[in-house]
Amino acid sequence: DIVVDQKPMESVKEGLRYVYNTKELLGALSLDLFAVLFGGAVAMIPVFAKDILNVGPIGFGWLNAAADIGAMLIIFIITLFPVNAGQGKKLLIAVGGFGICIIVFALSKIFWISFAALVLSGILDGFSMIVRGTIVQLKTPDHMRGRVMSVNSMFINSSNELGQFESGVAAKLMGVIPSVVFGGTMTILVVFTTWFKAPSLRKMEY
């Protein structure tokens, strides 16, 4: 039965409990939280455009749009060629590849390599978002859907904002390039940890 008079905080707690007890959901949402938290190179794009790649406003615009271009491409590709098997494993590989792209972007001194790395990061991030969103829908029963989607939104929104904060703090402490390399490396480390700690997510297929 649907409870209509439940207090908001109780609903949130129930959603968190369900996510925590469903390992595929916990793995998928944690993967997104920490990958975005550590892989937030987008916040540093203005610095890379001006001080490292030495490109003007047009170059900055292309760099800023690169990840979105990649995301649009993968949406079009998956519409034509759906992901048919091994989705959990492919999700982890995509997030790991995203971390590698962030490292390549950090180390590149050539505009087109930086641009290509960001486009590919957008493709991989878009792929992981599609697969992760499908897993969340499939593993959530109808009576829990609103609560779990609220938790999902909380994870996404908090990781985006905290990721930009982490990027700024890390850049201040380490320098811009080392901080972005650190973020990409931590993203890969999160993937390795999830690979072994969440086997049910790794083996997930739909």
Task: Label the model's feature ranges.
Residues D1-S30:
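Juxtamembrane intracellular "pre-TM" segments in multi-pass secondary transporters
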Residues S30-V36:
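Hydrophobic alpha-helical transmembrane segments of multi-pass membrane transport/permease proteins
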Residues L37-V47:
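Transmembrane-helix terminus/interface motifs of multi-pass secondary transporters
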Residues V4, L37, L92-V95:
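A generic short alpha-helical patch detector that favors 3-5-residue windows
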Residues K13, Y20, A28, I45-Y206:
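C-terminal transmembrane bundle of multi-pass solute transporters/carriers
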